[in-house]
Amino acid sequence: MFTVFLLVVLATTVVSSPSDRASDGRNAAANEKASDVIALALKGCCSNPVCHLEHSNMCGRRR
């Protein structure tokens, strides 16, 4: 539950941070990745060994 809380805080921080035009593409990519991580965490994917392996780039390599 704490992990989900941290992910939500991270996503909120990424979304609400001010940006300039040069970094808009990078921010969009970060927002998308944060959204994917939150979606996986909420689904319990990162705690499921099979799903974790399939999405190790989102869940982290270690288990």
UniProtKB/Swiss-Prot annotation:
Q: Which domain of life is it from?
A: Eukaryota
Statement: the UniProt record of this protein carries the keyword Disulfide bond: yes
Residue positions where Cysteine amide is found in the record: 59
The GO cellular component terms are: extracellular region; host cell postsynaptic membrane
Q: Which residues form the signal peptide?
A: 1-16
Proregion positions = 17-43
Checking InterPro entries in the record gives: Conotoxin_a-typ
Tissue specificity as recorded in UniProt = Expressed by the venom duct.
A Pfam family recorded for this sequence: Toxin_8
Q: Where in the cell is it found?
A: Secreted
Q: Which UniProt keywords apply?
A: Acetylcholine receptor inhibiting toxin, Amidation, Disulfide bond, Neurotoxin, Oxidation, Postsynaptic neurotoxin, Secreted, Signal, Toxin
Disulfide feature: 45-51, 46-59
Question: Which Gene Ontology molecular-function terms are recorded?
Answer: acetylcholine receptor inhibitor activity; toxin activity
Any idea which residues bear Methionine sulfoxide here?
Answer: 58
The family annotation for this protein states: Belongs to the conotoxin A superfamily.
Domain text from the record? The cysteine framework is I (CC-C-C). Alpha3/5 pattern.
Biological role: Alpha-conotoxins act on postsynaptic membranes, they bind to the nicotinic acetylcholine receptors (nAChR) and thus inhibit them.
UniProt protein name: Alpha-conotoxin-like Sm1.3
Q: What is the lineage of its organism?
A: Eukaryota, Metazoa, Spiralia, Lophotrochozoa, Mollusca
